[in-house]
């Protein structure tokens, strides 16, 4: 195993605790135990197969491994993404247990080393880490309508999250 080198300017920014660092996280962050979620391609394929069995989609309508492509195909046929959102394990996303990476990122934010964590994931593991750690003063932005809540310490769900009630906003699709 090779040694890793953290650049001195990054170490300095962490040590200063002035929120000079932002993380952008996504694919793979929630694979580790105890979160244990799959990559979106796996959920997309599973949802595609269910939607195919239910007569919503057919082979050739989209790339089954691309969740945005599946969302676009469902929307084109039904003018809604509801059937796709219902085919995803939404409750698993809502109750996702944070892993060591989530906990460390939120702890660094609570200590002032990180100002923003932007995630492309739907799961709530980062927000659940706030609760698990008892970290206060961290805002959550779940969508564009929440940008007024942006604060010195903020988690931003770039594609919304599992608590989004409007199913047609839940998954990004090309316009």
Q: Across the structure, where does each feature detected by a protein language model lie?
A:
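Conserved catalytic-core helix/loop/strand module for nucleotide-ribose chemistry
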Residues: 1-175
């Amino acid at each position: 195993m090779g040694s890793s080198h953290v650049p001195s300017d990054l170490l300095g920014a962490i040590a200063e605790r002035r929120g000079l660092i932002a993380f952008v996280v996504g694919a793979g962050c929630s694979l580790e135990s105890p979160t244990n979620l799959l990559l979106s391609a796996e959920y997309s394929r599973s949802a595609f197969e269910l939607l195919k069995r239910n007569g919503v989609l057919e082979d050739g309508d989209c790339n089954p491994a691309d969740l945005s492509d599946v969302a676009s195909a469902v929307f084109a046929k039904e003018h809604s993404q509801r059937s796709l959102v219902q085919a995803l394990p939404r409750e698993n996303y809502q109750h996702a247990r944070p892993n060591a990476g989530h906990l460390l990122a939120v702890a660094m934010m609570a200590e002032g080393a990180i100002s923003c964590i932007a995630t492309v994931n739907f799961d709530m593991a980062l927000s659940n880490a706030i609760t698990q750690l008892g970290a206060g003063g961290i805002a959550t932005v779940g969508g564009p309508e929440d940008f007024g809540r942006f604060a010195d310490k903020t988690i931003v769900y770039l594609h919304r999250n599992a608590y989004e009630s409007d199913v047609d906003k839940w998954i990004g699709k090309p316009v």
